[in-house]
Amino acid sequence: LNLASFEINFSNIGKIKKGAKVGVTALTWATNVTPIIQLGLIPVVVDISIATLNVSPETLTPHLSNIDVFFATNVLGFADKIDVIRKMCKKHNIVFIEDNCESLGSEVDNELLGNFGLAATFSFFVAHHISTIEGGMIVTDDENLYTALVMARANGWDRNLPSDKQAALRKKVGIDAFSAKYT
């Protein structure tokens, strides 16, 4: 799921460029770091606050000038000053993505985690808060990212998109009426 999130951002909508440095929480899981490496991105470990087990504005500050993306893991439903971190990322043009595999339903100042970054991932692995044995979801309010995610879910087909989005995409990439039957 994290691989999908990064790959879509990286290759399909161009928010993340190859070789970009991605800040990752020091307390994380291999499934957060491995996709970064697989896609030719460079992980940069950002220390945590021992009080919250998460990156804090203070631990993120030294990295603001040398990362392009920040992938925050909200451990055990906690998020240390995430609104401040969101503003810091925005000010420095850093793409902000949340990992909420342990934070489904958690709130900060009456705002659900998963609403702070460009996208947020949630895991439904057997050991997490909601389980379907495997799988997960990505949420976003970015229309381009959403469209790319819907198409990725359908192996690149545009069938699950509204007809106006299908028409716009087909026009953009030059797919004629005959070929459109197979997209």
Regions found by a protein language model. Give the residues of each.
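A generic local structural motif
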Residues: 4, 9-10, 57-58, 82-83, ...
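Short hydrophobic "helix-edge" motifs at membrane interfaces and signal-peptide entry regions
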Residues: 30, 89-90, 115, 131-133
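PLP-dependent aminotransferase-like
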Residues: 16-91, 95-100, 107
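Active-site region of PLP-dependent enzymes
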Residues: 103-109, 116-183
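Structured loop/turn residues at beta-strand edges in well-structured enzyme cores
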Residues: 17, 65, 114-115, 131
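Buried hydrophobic packing segments
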Residues: 1-5, 36, 136
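ANL superfamily AMP-binding
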Residues: 1-21
